[in-house]
């Protein structure tokens, strides 16, 4: 079964490349990345683009994993597909992001200048050391992150019916942006199975891949019995 993976703000498909080998043979990891996201005025426009690009690929059995910004994108994509009557993911793994009825984790991003935002990303573990060492790469990463976080701010939280597919919310025990109680708020967004998985670490707890896979693999193994 395919696992479509949606990266964090400022991230890209490379985040999930190591997952391919780790989750074989039962799961095909498909990283999702939309280039030039600055061309989208709102998150709704980005969701439209992702839905159009993935439409044929999502006809078969599939799952979503989204981290931070990617969790919101994955959730809104599932909502869009529910409205149009398209197949939903067999399950969704939503990581390090609060549901849309709560404030976005970095809703005050425009109160931070580029240096402050870069420092915050580094402190959170979201900026690799090889990028920090190169000012041009660092500046590009900060700019892309700001674009994605601004898209989060455009999310239109209309009344949304609970989705008919399981949701498993993941988070770090020491995440300064998203609390365990925030993650439990996803319960209202599904009419099916729900769980919260708290792993050791901060906002980027998933950098500890052995720990993540030890928790994720048993959940993946049960997805075949789920029906959405």
What are these regions (language model features)?
Residues 1-61, 100-117, 199-204, 223:
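Active-site catalytic motif of lipid deacylating hydrolases and related acyltransferases
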Residues 34, 79, 90-103, 124-125:
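Active-site nucleophile loop of the alpha/beta-hydrolase fold
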Residues 66-70, 74:
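Gly/Ala-rich beta-loop-alpha elbow adjacent to hydrolase catalytic centers
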Residues 142-160:
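Active-site nucleophile elbow and catalytic-triad environment of alpha/beta-hydrolase enzymes
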Residues 169-171, 175:
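Short beta-strand/loop motif that positions the catalytic acidic residue
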Residues 176-182:
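Conserved alpha/beta-hydrolase "acid-adjacent" motif
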Residues 188-204:
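Catalytic histidine neighborhood in serine/cysteine hydrolases
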Residues 206-222:
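Post-His helix in hydrolase/transferase enzymes
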């Amino acid at each position: 079964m395919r696992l479509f993976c949606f990266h964090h703000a400022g991230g890209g498909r490379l985040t999930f490349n190591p997952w391919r080998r780790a989750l074989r043979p039962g799961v095909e990891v498909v990283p999702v990345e939309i280039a030039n996201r600055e061309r989208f005025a709102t998150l709704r426009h980005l969701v439209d683009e992702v839905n159009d690009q993935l439409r044929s690929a999502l006809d078969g059995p599939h799952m979503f994993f989204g981290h931070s910004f990617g969790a919101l994108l994955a959730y809104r994509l599932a909502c869009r597909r529910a409205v149009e009557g398209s197949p939903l993911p067999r399950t969704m793994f939503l990581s390090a992001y609060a549901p849309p009825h709560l404030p976005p984790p970095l809703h005050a991003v425009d109160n931070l200048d580029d240096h402050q935002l870069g420092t915050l990303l580094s402190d959170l573990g979201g900026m690799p050391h090889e990028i920090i060492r190169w000012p041009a790469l660092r500046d590009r990463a900060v700019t892309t992150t700001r674009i994605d976080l601004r898209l989060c701010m455009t999310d239109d939280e209309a009344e949304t019916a609970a989705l008919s597919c399981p949701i498993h919310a993941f988070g770090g025990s020491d995440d300064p942006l998203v609390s365990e109680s925030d993650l439990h708020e996803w319960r209202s967004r599904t009419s099916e199975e729900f769980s919260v998985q708290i792993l050791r670490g901060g906002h980027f707890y998933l950098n500890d891949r052995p720990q993540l896979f030890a928790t994720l693999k048993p959940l993946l193994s049960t997805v075949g019995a789920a029906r959405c």
